[in-house]
Amino acid sequence: MEILKAVENVNNRQKRILFKKLYNHFKGELAGKTVALWGLSFKPETDDMSAAPSIDTINMLMDAGCHVRVYDPVAMNATKRRWSTVYCGLDMYDAVKGADAVLLLTEWRQFRIPAWQIVKSLMRTPVIIDGRNVYDGDEIEEQGFTYYCIGR
C-alpha cells in the first residue's frame, strides 16, 4: 500500500508542474490572465477525461482567477458539461485568441506542428508550456516565444 500511495503522490505532483511553471512565469499574478489548453483527454485518440491532468489544471487555473480557453479534437462535449465558464474553441487557433499562455496537455497529432506565427499573432503574450515535451524549445524560442517544458 505504501508504494501505491507514493505513486499517487508523484502523480499529483506531476499534475501541478505545469501550473507551477505558469505561476512562476507570471510571478504569481495569474488573476485575469487568459490561458489556453491544447488537449484535454487522458491520451490522444480518445475522449476519456476520467483521469486526465486537464481536470486539475483547469480547476487550478479557475481557482487562480484565470480565464480558460480550450481545444481538444474529441473531448469538447465532456468539457462543456463539466465547466460552463470555460471557452471551448472551434479549433486550436481559436482557443489561443487573446491568450497569455498556451499549455500543451495531450499530444494530439494536430498539435505537433502548429503554424507558430499564426499562434503568436493571436496571443497576447507568446508563452508556450509544453507538458508533453513535443516541441523543439530552440525552434519555438527562435519564433519569439518563451518556452517551458518538463524536466529540462
Regions found by a protein language model. Name each.
Residues 1-152:
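Structural/interface elements that position substrates and couple domains in central-metabolism enzymes
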